Amino acid sequence: MNFKYIVAVSFLIASGYARSEENDVQSLSQREVLEEETLREIRGIGGALLSAGKSALKGLAKGLAEHFANGKRTAKGHEVMKRLEAVMRDLDSLDHPEEASERETRGFNQEEIANLFTKKEKRILGPVLSLVGSALGGLIKKIG
């Protein structure tokens, strides 16, 4: 009788422990799913903001390119035009990163790919802002 009692209690303890482990694993996987969904939402918002920023920069760059294309070109204006064209190509490559950098990203893991695009965006935004500033400064000087 004592042996059966010990076996039954041991079985109950083992099954209770297994259930608690199973619950821990389920709650952990639920937390991971929630974290993944949150990250997707954040990436979606960031992607939308980045897309809007790229569209605005594209529109501004196109406007500046048209302005410089219509007037007389000096050496400085020609250089600015070439930079704007390069920026436009880079912005287009950001819209289709899988096509534009397929050769560059082969063999990289996801984190390295994300770092590559972040560096590329920083590399593009710096010259774009300086070009916009210099173009607006030139326009203000001509107007004033």
From Swiss-Prot:
GO terms for biological process: defense response to bacterium; defense response to fungus; killing of cells of another organism. The modification Isoleucine amide is found at I143. Coiled coil: none annotated. InterPro entries: Bombinin. One of its GO terms (cellular component) is extracellular region. Residues 19-43, 74-123 form a propeptide. It comes from the Eukaryota. The keyword Signal applies. This is Maximins 6/Hv. The lineage of its organism: Eukaryota, Metazoa, Chordata, Craniata, Vertebrata.
